[in-house]
Structures are given as C-alpha cells and as structure tokens.
Amino acid sequence: MASITRLDAVSPYLIRRFKNDLRALDAVKQSNCVYVGNLSFYTTEEQIYALFSKCGEIRRIIMGVDRFTKTPCGFCFVEYFENQDALDSLKYISRTSLDERIIRADLDHGYEEGRQYGRGASGGQVRDEMREEFDPGRGGYAKNRQPTSSRQLANYSGISSAPLGSSLELQSNPRYNRWKKN
C-alpha cells in the first residue's frame, strides 16, 4: 500500500536524538530555526537568503565555518521569525538544488554561540572527514586523507625483494611545469 510522507515533519535523525526527551522534541517542532546542510563551500550568505526568503521573513543566517581557518564548511542555520515559515522551508526547499548540490534542511532546536564551528578533528564537518570520493564543491578530497606516498608506504611496506634492476624506493612523480623550458 502506498503511503504519503509529510515534508514538514521532524526528521528521523531528530526523533532518534530526542527519543527519551519528548519535551525537547516538541520544542524542536515549534522552533523557527532550520539547519541547512550539504552546501557547497562556495555558497554565499546572499544565495541562501535569496532562496530561503521565498518561504518567509528571515531573522538571521549563521554560516557554519571551519573552527581553525574560519572559512565556510558547508552548513548554515536560517532563523525565521515564524515557525510556519521554517516548516514551509522544509516542504519547499529541502532536497532542492543550490550551487549544483542537493541541500538538506531540518528543524533545529535553535542556534547557540559556538555551533557555527565545524566539529570535525580538522575543524570542518565530521562527514567531510569520512568522505572517500573527490568532491569539488566541498573542497576536494577529505581533509584527513593521507597523501599518496604515505598510502603506498603502508600498502607496500611488506615487500622486501624486487626483480633484478629495479628499486624498492618510493618514487614521486615529478610535477609537469608547462612554463619551464626543457
């Protein structure tokens, strides 16, 4: 049998997070603050304002920044004046595209000082540190990804012999410089 899912409902993540605290879950349902994730590192506050203001009057936008470099790290908080505007943004804007990325929006219990900083070990978001693939909109490879020579050393350190005429030393690829005359 088919079912219909409400688009302005609290996410399964928040239900799991507040499963033992129904008061906190009810407070989130009445919140006028929206967490927006999966933003490009290059998305501006003006772009977010232009998109989210279509659902109601915005009180403020707080951009998430890297804890160390203070550069955008792919999330923000949008505070509306009314709860209904926040719910409308979940219905109409969540899972839409902004800067060629599908954004995620969810109700949030409210912004507090310090929450604008990424919580990952490298200063950004935790999910970016776990990413395996190259993502140009989120700064390329994950920040904790090892350089190629370190991975080669770990993968091939057990090899102790080589065919005659070859070497076991790791070779780095020289960078091609198109401006250098050969």
Curated annotation (Swiss-Prot):
Keywords: Cytoplasm, mRNA processing, mRNA splicing, mRNA transport, Nucleus, RNA-binding, Transport. Residues 114-182 are annotated as: Disordered. Gene3D superfamilies: 3.30.70.330. Residues 145-175 have a biased composition (Polar residues). MRNA binds at Y13, Y35, R104, A105, D106, L107, D108, R115, Q116, Y117, G118, R119, Q125, V126. Belongs to the RRM NCBP2 family. Component of the nuclear cap-binding complex (CBC), a heterodimer composed of cbc1 and cbc2 that interacts with capped RNAs. This is Nuclear cap-binding protein subunit 2. The lineage of its organism: Eukaryota, Fungi, Dikarya, Ascomycota, Taphrinomycotina.
